[in-house]
């Protein structure tokens, strides 16, 4: 498999079109400022469709202009990235890596996050975005990629394990859902 990561003068750059195991053509690339409104719309849709993400749509205080600035910041970052997966020109999902911190003791660690529109679940887009973020994290020099996942989200846990992530802890009351009460979070990490 060809890497989509490119060295772009100290900036994280990713651009690749792939065909998933299910035969879906997916274009994955950096989110850029002009994507602000479509990424924001995708955020609201994905966060309304599932109880597995950290926030609810009504808790988001970003507008399209702020989302554009956020994406622009990511485009110019040497060690953080926000990727968008497109299927037939439509945003199917987003994923990204964020530095845990700049301090020496934690500079080797990054956090991974992902959200996929429900209509695209099980089609390989999550796997493709996860693999792309792993490539980018390695290229940025991280030694460890981390995530939290709701324990009931068996499909995501299986995908993360297939990608090499291992469980290192649990928080029985990690999330408090409006619908399900407390949800257990599993902390996972991938050594790069």
Regions from the PLM with identified roles:
Residues 146-149, 161, 166-182:
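Conserved catalytic-core motifs of GNAT/GCN5-like acyltransferases
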Residues 130, 137-148:
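Conserved GNAT acetyl-CoA-binding A-motif
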Residues 123, 127, 139, 152-170:
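Conserved active-site alpha-helix within GNAT-family acetyltransferase domains
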Residues 60-119, 130, 191:
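Acetyl-CoA-dependent GNAT
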Residues 22, 41-58:
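Helix-loop element at the rim of GNAT/NAT acetyltransferase active sites that forms part
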Residues 26-38:
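A short beta-loop-alpha structural element at the N-terminal edge
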Residues 10-24, 179-192:
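Terminal substrate-recognition subdomain of acyl/acetyltransferases
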């Amino acid at each position: 498999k060809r890497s989509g990561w490119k060295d772009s003068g100290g900036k994280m750059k990713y651009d690749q079109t792939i065909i998933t195991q299910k035969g879906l053509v997916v274009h994955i690339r950096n989110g850029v400022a002009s994507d602000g409104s479509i990424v924001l719309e995708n955020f609201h849709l994905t966060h309304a469709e599932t109880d597995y993400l950290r926030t609810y749509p009504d808790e988001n205080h970003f507008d399209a202009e702020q989302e554009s600035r956020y994406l622009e910041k990511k485009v110019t970052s040497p060690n953080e990235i926000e990727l968008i997966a497109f299927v037939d020109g439509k945003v199917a999902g987003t994923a990204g890596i964020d530095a845990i911190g700049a301090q020496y003791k934690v500079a080797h660690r990054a956090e991974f996050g992902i959200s996929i529109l429900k209509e695209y679940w099980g089609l390989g887009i999550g796997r493709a975005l996860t693999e792309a973020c792993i490539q980018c994290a390695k290229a940025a020099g991280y030694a460890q990629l981390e995530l939290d996942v709701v324990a009931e989200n068996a499909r995501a846990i299986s995908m993360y394990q297939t990608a090499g992530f291992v469980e290192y802890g649990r928080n029985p009351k990690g999330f408090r859902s409006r619908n399900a009460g407390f949800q257990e979070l599993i902390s996972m990490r991938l050594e790069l």
